[in-house]
């Protein structure tokens, strides 16, 4: 039963892969399929620098589900020439190319070559630069022919400030202008992305037949109804049922979930995760969520912004069985859903830490030389070695279980009031909640931290990352763009600046290299508390100007000299700044009647092998989706 349920849900997850490619950019499916046709069908020399560079480019496109970086959102620069690629495309069997009806190979090249090779065409998937039209300058495929002002006006007209249970406007549609009229093209069966959603529904239907509990059966039925109707009220009903389904050992996310890929933060990318509960590790998160009211009451936030009664925060540690869509191959380590503020305050939220993913990261990080290069002295190294794995997991738990679930909006405040800054402010709020409490004696009392000093490992690595080492993920000359990175720099730079007079945190030089030194850990905690109070105020009151000022002052700009130094030191370590995961492969064993008797799991599939299999077996959408 369990195995069949996991198998059906993983199939439902894999069927959605093409949706995300198309959401990330309208040429992504065409370009991916051209590259795959050349990669598999090219008869020329595959050892030339051009072919090798094309292979790297294709592997990056697979990794980012498109031609823009999955994190920084800048467009990839191909290391191969247009001449090589044109000749290669013309040399393969035309039947393997994504040609539109009546289109020649030459016309196909003409259509997409500027998108691949011209750095000025669609340079950024999500543009967050203040003062620009964020919709027109972003390459993501959530809007077509509309300006930022038109998009904002369209959705503001739909909103009713008096509605206390608003739907997530715009969540599941592309906003387009056709014949001068602005309208939504909804992602649903029979609508946009219908071919993929039909397949997802087919496998969900099978999963419904072997659901573990009546609650889970109801969740799956409601999700199918949402996919079939595209009705956002139905989506809210599904989210409420999902939050309340706490007894199933197997759980899943499948749908349009996070809005980081939309410059206006409304439209959601498609993702899926199938998982089962890690019963032993979940005791840790249940201890935290069981004390949620204590944490809320004692937080350093103004009382008017606190929840009087914390509702249904459920927390668990899970083992991921499959990653898909926007969670594959690079994934989150923790998830807290649903995102609708009113559902969270009325019905609670589900928070998960993905145990097998954090475990893999921890194992990969030990002994790779990174800390030895960037940590100031042996004293900090010993702290990190002793406690960082524990405090890091705890910080994730606190961020997901309590941070996102804490605080409240004042009545009448639009949840989208912070616009483009909303994601960064929300991530900073959750991180600060975790940072403030990871140092609390309450955690030692609950047996969650092994000693009163353990939190120092988290404070040191967090500030080192926010002030310095996360810059390894950014190209020279670029700003910080991604919401999670912006939030970390915002917190670290703000604490550094506000504590400067007392030298709470310093950047010092030793042997010509820059290091972070924390001189007063308790004052750092006080500063985290002060910033948490301010960020909660901004969120609760919908203070757009306050969000703008904080983010633009601390989170965006990079010190070019420090950046160059960090990149130089990192380069010598020969490490990759991002990590992704290959999924296990599930196969069914059937009896003579075709009934499933077992599901086998194998882990021997390579990265390119898996990506090509997915492109073959789960190609659910045409190359152009209008």
Each model region followed by its residue ranges:
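Conserved small/polar residues in nucleotide/adenosyl-binding loops
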Residues: 1-5
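Short, glycine/acidic-rich hinge or "gate" loops at secondary-structure transitions
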Residues: 18-23, 214-221, 235, 413-416, ...
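Contiguous, non-catalytic segments that form substrate-binding/exosite surfaces or channel walls
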Residues: 50-382, 388
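Active-site recognition of the HExxH zinc-binding catalytic motif
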Residues: 213, 391-408, 430, 435
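C-terminal interaction module
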Residues: 281-304, 308-316, 494-567
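Post-HEXXH active-site segment of zinc metalloproteases
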Residues: 407-428
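Long, well-structured alpha-helical subdomains associated
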Residues: 435-538
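Extended, compositionally biased alpha-helical segments that mediate assembly or anchoring
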Residues: 519-626
